[in-house]
Design a protein with these regions (language model features):
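Short beta-strand segments
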Residues: 9, 45, 62, 109-113
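Short glycine/serine/proline-enriched coil/turn segments at secondary-structure junctions
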Residues: 23, 44, 91-95
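Terminal connector regions
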Residues: 89-130
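Asparagine-centered strand-capping/turn motif at beta-strand->loop junctions
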Residues: 37-41
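Short acidic, flexible loop segments centered on an aromatic residue
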Residues: 43-62, 103
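Short, solvent-exposed loop/turn segments enriched in Ser/Thr/Gly
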Residues: 28-34, 97-98
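Low-complexity, acidic Ser/Thr/Pro/Gly-rich terminal tails and inter-domain linkers that flank the onset
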Residues: 1-27
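Intrinsically disordered, low-complexity Pro/Gly/Ser/Thr-rich segments with frequent PxxP/GP/PP motifs
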Residues: 62-94
Length: 130
């Protein structure tokens, strides 16, 4: 599990390779990832936008920006959490993702929180030590 905390908001990510939606012969690899956002602060916040950078094993990057996550802009009161699962395809057997969410407080203050960089590894990927 991958974890980042910004302004008392914790984001955890758990990626999972999905073999039944992947085909090495067609250079298609698919992962699901489950994200849990927990508000440990004292203010109610709302997730407004997402910004992802997805990088495959060849170094190709894809940038994804949009409103909310999975069609929602969740509101998190103090102590509340929001969990969702989404997915990502790549044409290589491994890669990684990183990102940010834009949040807004009840008073209208906007700020960004980090989504931890997380690895997308399939059984076909070769381990590389940097």
């Amino acid at each position: 599990m991958y974890r980042a905390v910004t302004r008392q908001i914790e984001v955890t990510v758990e990626p999972n390779f999905v073999p039944e939606q992947s085909s090495a012969d067609r250079s298609r690899y698919f992962w699901s990832y489950t994200i849990v956002i927990t508000n440990s602060g004292e203010e109610t916040v709302q997730l407004k936008t997402r910004h992802w950078i997805i990088t495959d094993a060849s170094g190709r990057q894809q940038e994804v920006k949009g409103e909310g996550v999975v069609g929602e802009q969740p509101i998190l009161g103090p102590g509340e959490r929001f969990e969702y699962t989404s997915g990502v395809p790549l044409s290589t057997a491994s890669g990684f993702m990183t990102g940010r969410y834009q949040m807004v407080t009840e008073s209208g203050e906007r700020f960004e929180i980090d989504v931890p960089a997380f690895s997308l590894d399939s059984p076909d990927s070769k381990r590389v030590l940097n």
